[in-house]
């Protein structure tokens, strides 16, 4: 439904180019999350490595069927913690800095259709599922991760529990034998659930997507204090016991809109109490529209989310299904996330996962290409994820070429890393290697082209911070070629990263912010020449190249214009732009205040041209605001745009 807004905008005359001292500018707190520079390895403990066969005897163990426990556990994932081992030390060797594990809590009893090997059917949230190990095993896992300087991210569920509640003519009940099936005790109280039937056809008052049972699982009333405070107590203890650095929150779009506003501050306080000052929470909100997705961050106050729009766009580009302009269009939405507390660089990016399927399978299904293109296109997708904005996450097994059989999604995307007993997985095709047969995937890791490439990409990020989620500017996006400039503020050096999804080499002239010193190739085999700030490069087919300038950025001139603001009817926010022209990679910070003597409030910082932020009318309803924007170039010079005034009517 469209809403009418009244907008009154007054701007001053165009300000001449000038460096200014801006002592009155308020300090802007960093919006970067604690994982902002990390590389995440996402893994199913049950499918990684069996380190303790004594826990294979519990009900639900059936390594020949895809829907049951297969024997992997915390001991297997931990390993010996020594170099050359296949546990955490192997993950560290691949270049990852954080490990995200599926939920470890005790699962409901297995059914004839499967067991909770994936961790999303929890009933006892205070203990480790015995199939995966014990609390002592979890302590050892955490200690090994700390020794290897690996951060731990735990997948958690707050929307629902395992399926214990039944219905009789729309009346919910718990059978006597399951009356105390859940832990802690408040989870056994029917009053803490919505009890309105399936999400697809619920009978309650409210949106079924939030109050209905997710695939038959018991939907909690996450709007109730007993629930959000109870979950805060539960998951705070996991942080305190094991020193976790982050949570991935499953089904985050299905909880109450205000849940994270109540829950997250308690989680962050618990983390700080044990010395973790920048705990990261990212939610699973399966929506490929960035306009929808950003509202979960800006209005619902999820710290950050998994970037489903990036997944779709990156895979389509890597497959050759779409061209570079589509990637450019995606990044144009990044300003929607910008605020004083959020930024698109905090989004957790990925190419495939345990639900939709693996990246190679998705690339294969997007467009008919020659069989020998699948490997380079898979590498291209990973390079785009590693070197553009966001926090990359790689799904376990992708590094050894796992693809998937049939549709390749859900159960069929959760293969064993150890020697499998599932028949279809023994003969399943792989990208970059042969079917695994009776062997295991650890033996082929060091020689696998994807694993080797990921190590190279990780090494480049580690040696060159500009490549690791730093400032980014799109320099060229046409047909099959996308070229980005990257910059780390501390270094002041410009990098060019070019991605070619075409089967032919592409030549282009790229205008940069560096006019002297030439360029050094860090990745790939490009043909490069430079004249002043224009770099002429030829990027080989289906490849990524990285160039580093030999001298610091020197094209730092800035021309400032005016601030404009008008309603963006697609998002419902006020798009507020700063007219700034420069070849440099700048920082533009926007501010507002509602009275002449009031404090300046940060609206966020944009580091990618064109420079803009989006003002949420719900935050400033019926207020007259004075707007201000400052610009900082690579040499540290500051500029200020003329102030503007805006009045926002009630939504």
What is each stretch, according to the model?
Residues 142, 160, 233-343, 347, ...:
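Active-site-proximal helices and loops of the catalytic beta/alpha 8
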Residues 82-91, 442, 510, 610-620:
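Signal that preferentially marks extracellular ectodomain short beta-strand elements
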Residues 563-651:
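Long, low-complexity serine/threonine/glycine- and acidic-rich segments characteristic of extracellular
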Residues 5-6, 12, 16-42, 57-63, ...:
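Carbohydrate-interacting/catalytic domains
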Residues 48-57, 357-360, 425-427:
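Short, solvent-exposed loop/turn elements at domain surfaces
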Residues 26-27, 31-39, 46-242, 262-274, ...:
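Substrate-binding/active-site clefts of carbohydrate-active enzymes
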Residues 39-44, 97-103, 124, 151-155, ...:
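Structural recognition of the beta-strand scaffold that forms the well-ordered cores
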Residues 344-371:
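Active-site clefts of carbohydrate-active enzymes
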């Amino acid at each position: 439904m469209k809403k009418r807004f009244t907008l009154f905008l007054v701007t001053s005359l165009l300000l001449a180019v000038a460096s200014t001292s801006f002592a009155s500018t308020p300090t802007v707190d960093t919006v970067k999350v604690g994982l902002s520079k990390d590389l995440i390895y996402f893994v199913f403990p049950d499918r990684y490595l069996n380190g303790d066969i004594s826990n294979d005897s519990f009900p639900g163990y059936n390594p020949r069927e895809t829907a049951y426990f297969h024997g992997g556990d915390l001991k297997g994932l931990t390993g010996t913690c020594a170099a050359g081992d296949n546990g955490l030390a192997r993950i560290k060797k691949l270049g990852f800095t954080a490990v995200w594990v599926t939920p470890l809590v005790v699962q409901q009893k297995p059914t004839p259709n499967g067991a909770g090997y994936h961790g999303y059917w929890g009933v006892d949230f205070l203990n480790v599922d015995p199939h995966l190990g014990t609390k002592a095993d979890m302590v050892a896992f955490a200690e090994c991760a700390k020794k290897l300087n690996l951060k731990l991210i735990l997948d958690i569920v707050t929307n629902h529990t395992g399926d214990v509640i039944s219905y009789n003519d729309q009346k919910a009940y718990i059978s006597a034998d399951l009356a105390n099936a859940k832990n802690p005790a408040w989870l056994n109280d029917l009053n803490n659930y919505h009890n309105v039937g399936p999400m697809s056809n619920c009978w309650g008052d409210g949106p079924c997507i939030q109050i209905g049972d997710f695939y038959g699982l018991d939907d909690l009333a996450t709007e109730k204090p007993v629930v959000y405070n109870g979950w805060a107590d539960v998951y705070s203890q996991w942080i305190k016991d094991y020193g976790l650095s982050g949570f991935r929150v499953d089904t985050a779009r299905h909880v109450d809109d205000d849940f994270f506003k109540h829950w997250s501050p308690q989680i962050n306080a618990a983390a700080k109490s044990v010395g973790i000052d920048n705990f990261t929470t990212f939610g699973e909100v399966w929506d490929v529209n960035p306009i929808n997705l950003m509202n979960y961050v800006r209005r619902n106050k999820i710290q950050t989310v998994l970037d489903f729009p990036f997944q779709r766009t990156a895979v389509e580009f890597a497959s050759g299904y779409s061209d570079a302009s589509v990637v450019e269009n995606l990044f144009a939405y990044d300003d929607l996330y910008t605020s004083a507390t959020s930024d698109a660089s905090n989004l957790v990016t990925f190419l495939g996962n345990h639900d939709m399927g693996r990246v190679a399978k998705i690339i294969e299904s997007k467009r008919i290409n020659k069989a020998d293109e699948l490997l380079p296109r898979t590498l291209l997708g990973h390079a785009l994820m590693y070197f553009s904005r966001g926090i990359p996450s790689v799904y376990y097994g992708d590094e050894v070429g796992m693809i998937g059989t049939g549709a390749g999604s859900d159960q069929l995307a959760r293969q064993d890393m150890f020697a499998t007993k599932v028949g279809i997985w023994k003969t399943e095709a792989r990208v970059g290697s042969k079917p695994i047969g009776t062997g295991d995937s650890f033996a082929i890791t060091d020689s696998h082209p994807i694993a080797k490439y990921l190590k190279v990409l990780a090494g480049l990020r580690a040696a060159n911070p500009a490549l690791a989620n730093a400032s980014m500017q799109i320099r060229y996006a046409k047909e099959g070629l996308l070229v980005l400039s990257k910059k780390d503020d501390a270094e002041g050096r410009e990098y060019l990263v070019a991605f070619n999804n075409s089967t032919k080499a592409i030549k282009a002239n790229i205008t940069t912010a560096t006019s002297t010193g030439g360029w050094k190739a860090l990745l790939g085999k490009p043909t490069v020449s430079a004249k002043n700030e224009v770099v002429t490069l030829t990027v080989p087919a289906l490849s990524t190249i990285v160039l580093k300038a030999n001298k610091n950025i020197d094209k730092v001139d800035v021309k400032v214009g005016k601030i404009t603001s008008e309603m963006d009817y697609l998002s419902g926010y006020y798009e507020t732009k700063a007219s700034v022209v420069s070849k440099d990679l700048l920082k533009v910070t926007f501010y507002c205040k509602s009275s002449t003597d009031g404090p300046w409030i940060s609206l966020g910082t944009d580091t990618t041209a064109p420079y803009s932020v989006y003002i949420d009318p719900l935050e400033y309803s019926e207020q007259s605001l004075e707007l201000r924007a400052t610009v900082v170039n690579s040499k540290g010079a500051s500029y200020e745009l003329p102030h503007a005034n805006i009045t926002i009517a009630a939504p």
